[in-house]
């Protein structure tokens, strides 16, 4: 378990560093489009999690430390949007469309409301 934990920690650090570098680069080149960094890492993270998930389904022998390090660690550090997208896709694939769309709506609206609430808390 130590190996898996270490893989997640290292992957997370690398994902965070890539997100930070992406944000800095985009801010330096297109400061008026600050949101582009988040959009870029979210879309890239979704592409990568879909690819990795597919590869890991085809290759169940891939060690847990590598799977966890890449998905929970690297992509978790880069973006949590990729995990959210995969969860939604898996619900749809398993025939649970109503739950998938409820999860989608609650996640987006809940995230927006929680972000707003956090902002409001700073003003108290």
Curated annotation (Swiss-Prot):
Question: In terms of one coarse class, where is the protein primarily found?
Answer: membrane
Gene Ontology cellular component list: plasma membrane
The portions of this protein that span the membrane are 1-21, 34-54, 62-82, 101-121
Instruction: List, alphabetically, the InterPro entries matched.
Output: FluC
> Catalytic activity annotated for this protein?
fluoride(in) = fluoride(out)
Compartment(s): Cell inner membrane
Listed A to Z, the keywords are: Cell inner membrane, Cell membrane, Ion channel, Ion transport, Membrane, Metal-binding, Sodium, Transmembrane, Transmembrane helix, Transport
**One family name in Pfam for this protein:** CRCB
**Top-rank taxon, per record:** Bacteria
Activity-regulation annotation: Na(+) is not transported, but it plays an essential structural role and its presence is essential for fluoride channel function.
Report a single Gene Ontology molecular function: metal ion binding
Quick one: which residues bind Na(+)? 76, 79
Q: Does the keyword Nucleotidyltransferase apply?
A: no
Q: Name one GO biological process term.
A: cellular detoxification of fluoride
What topology does it adopt in the membrane?
Answer: Multi-pass membrane protein
**Stated family:** Belongs to the fluoride channel Fluc/FEX (TC 1.A.43) family.
Give the protein's function: Fluoride-specific ion channel. Important for reducing fluoride concentration in the cell, thus reducing its toxicity.
Give the matching PANTHER family. Answer: FLUORIDE EXPORT PROTEIN 1-RELATED
What NCBIfam families does the record tag this protein with?
Answer: PRK14234.1 (NF010830)
Q: Which protein, by its recorded name, is this?
A: Fluoride-specific ion channel FluC
Q: Which gene encodes it?
A: fluC
């Amino acid at each position: 378990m130590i190996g898996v934990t270490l893989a997640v920690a290292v992957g997370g650090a690398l994902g965070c560093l890539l997100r930070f570098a992406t944000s800095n680069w985009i801010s330096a080149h297109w400061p008026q489009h600050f949101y582009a960094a988040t959009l870029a890492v979210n879309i890239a993270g979704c592409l990568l999690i879909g690819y990795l998930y597919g590869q890991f389904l085809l290759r169940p022998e891939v060690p847990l430390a590598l799977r966890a390090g890449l998905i929970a660690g690297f992509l978790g550090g880069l973006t949590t949007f990729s995990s959210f997208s995969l969860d939604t896709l898996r619900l749809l694939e398993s025939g649970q469309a109503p739950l998938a769309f409820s999860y989608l709506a609650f996640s987006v609206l809940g995230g927006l409301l929680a972000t707003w609430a956090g902002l409001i808390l700073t003003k108290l």
